[in-house]
């Protein structure tokens, strides 16, 4: 009868039966070995990505970012389209949307941020306070369960 070899633990089990494998795979040392294996694997993947990116940058395949170096003397960098600024040639200045004037140097809130207080022209809700916004946005669960990759030598996944 063939023995079962666990690549994570680098050991043979006494015999190849589902109960022995299940007991082994639920053990503390096996779980630590699996965790260590995948931790090392992730570190190797990250280092590989860093090395590839560095090599591509040194070969000139990746251009430097536009704001990595200071602009040349006398150069004016236009503001991004989402930020207020003086109108550019050929552009009409944006009219204000009928609300109260903005505080100087404040500007509208960034996209995705809610202003504090009621909207212009709206009264606060009954009770006198605004409802609290929930904490950080929740991530939705993946569309299907994620599968843990198996290594060579592991004949069947744990159940």
UniProtKB/Swiss-Prot annotation:
The modification Phosphotyrosine is found at residue 8. The modification N6-acetyllysine is found at residue 52. It is found in: Nucleus. Keywords: Acetylation, Metal-binding, Nucleus, Phosphoprotein, Ribonucleoprotein, RNA-binding, Zinc, Zinc-finger. GO terms for molecular function: mRNA binding; pre-mRNA 5'-splice site binding; protein homodimerization activity; RNA binding; single-stranded RNA binding; zinc ion binding. SMART domains: ZnF_U1. One of its GO terms (cellular component) is commitment complex. One of its GO terms (biological process) is spliceosomal snRNP assembly. A zinc finger (Matrin-type) spans 4-36. Signal peptide: none annotated. The keyword Metal-binding applies. Residues 63-92 have a biased composition (Pro residues). Residues 62-96, 140-159 are annotated as: Disordered. PROSITE patterns: ZF_MATRIN (PS50171). InterPro entries: Matrin/U1-C_Znf_C2H2, Matrin/U1-like-C_Znf_C2H2, U1-CZ_Znf_C2H2, U1_snRNP-C, Znf_C2H2_sf. The modification Phosphoserine is found at residue 17. Belongs to the U1 small nuclear ribonucleoprotein C family. Component of the U1 snRNP. The U1 snRNP is composed of the U1 snRNA and the 7 core Sm proteins SNRPB, SNRPD1, SNRPD2, SNRPD3, SNRPE, SNRPF and SNRPG that assemble in a heptameric protein ring on the Sm site of the small nuclear RNA to form the core snRNP, and at least 3 U1 snRNP-specific proteins SNRNP70/U1-70K, SNRPA/U1-A and SNRPC/U1-C. SNRPC/U1-C interacts with U1 snRNA and the 5' splice-site region of the pre-mRNA. Interacts (via N-terminus) with TIA1 (via C-terminus); thereby promoting spliceosomal U1 snRNP recruitment to 5' splice sites. Component of the spliceosomal U1 snRNP, which is essential for recognition of the pre-mRNA 5' splice-site and the subsequent assembly of the spliceosome. SNRPC/U1-C is directly involved in initial 5' splice-site recognition for both constitutive and regulated alternative splicing. The interaction with the 5' splice-site seems to precede base-pairing between the pre-mRNA and the U1 snRNA. Stimulates commitment or early (E) complex formation by stabilizing the base pairing of the 5' end of the U1 snRNA and the 5' splice-site region. This is U1 small nuclear ribonucleoprotein C. It comes from Homo sapiens. The gene is SNRPC.
């Amino acid at each position: 009868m063939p023995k079962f070899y666990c690549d994570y633990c680098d050991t043979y089990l006494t015999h190849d039966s589902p109960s022995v494998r299940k007991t082994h795979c639920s053990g503390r040392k096996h779980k630590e070995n699996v965790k260590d294996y995948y931790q090392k694997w992730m570190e190797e993947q990250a280092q590989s990505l860093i090395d590839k990116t560095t090599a591509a940058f040194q070969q000139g395949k990746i251009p430097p970012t536009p704001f990595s170096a200071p602009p040349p003397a006398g150069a004016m960098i236009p503001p991004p389209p989402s930020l207020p600024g003086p109108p550019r040639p050929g552009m009409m200045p944006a009219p204000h949307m009928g609300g109260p004037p903005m505080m100087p140097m404040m500007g509208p809130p960034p996209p995705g941020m809610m202003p504090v207080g009621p909207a212009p022209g709206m009264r606060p809700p009954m009770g006198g306070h605004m409802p609290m916004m929930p904490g950080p946005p929740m991530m939705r669960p993946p569309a299907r369960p994620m599968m843990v990759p198996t290594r060579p030598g592991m004949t069947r996944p744990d159940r």
